[in-house]
Amino acid sequence: TGVYHLTLLHFLCDKFETFIFNPLVTNCNKNVDIRKVKNDKKDSIKIAKIGKFQDVKCSSSFDIEIYTLKSLCRDYYKITDSKSTFKKKLSTDLRVIFPGYITVFSNITCKTSMAILKEFSSPESILNADKDYLINLISSNSKKGLVHSEAIYKKLISASEDAVYICINSPSLFVKITNTLSIIENFEIQLANLLKEINFLMKSNRIPDNFKQNVALIYSIP
C-alpha cells in the first residue's frame, strides 16, 4: 500500500524488527493464481510466504524526517502541476474573452500581467483606463522603467482595440478570468510555504549529513 502501512510500521518499530516489502512485489506474487480472489486473509498468508520462502528485497529502515521531506516534495510538484493546468486554462479563456492579450506578455502569469488582469479584465476596461495610471501600474510591477512600461502600454492598447471587435463580449465570462487568477495566486502561496519548509528541514540537524551530501552531489551535476 502507499500510506496505510506507515502508522502500523511506526508503532511496531518501537518493539520489533520490522521489514517493508515493495507493494509491486507482493502484488505480482499474489496474482499468480488463475482466479483472482480478493481476500485479506488469503493475501496476508501469501505475503507471509513471500517473506519466508522467497529471496526478495526489503527495507528495514524508516526515517520520519526523510519521509516528511519526500512527502513535502511530492506535494510541491503536484501543486506545480495543478498550477500549470490553470495557467493553460487562463490562456484558453483569454483567447476567447481577450484575443491578442497573450501577445503582450511572454508570460501571462507574471506579476505585471496578473496585476492588469485583476484590475482590468476586459478590453473595454483597458481602453477606458487612465493612461498614466495604467503605465504606472505596469512600471510598479515590472520594475523596468518608463520606456519599457510605455512600450507594454502601446501593445496592450493595440491588442485591446482589436479584441473589442473579435472577442466574445459577455460580462459574465470575465468572472472566469478573476476566478482562475485567484486559484493561481493561491497555488503560489502554497508553493512558497512548502518550499520554505523544505529548505528549513534540509538546513536543520533533523536530516542526516550523508543525505544532505547526496543531495548536494545531485545538485552538482551540470
Predicted regions and their residues:
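A detector of single, family-specific signature residues
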Residues: 1-222
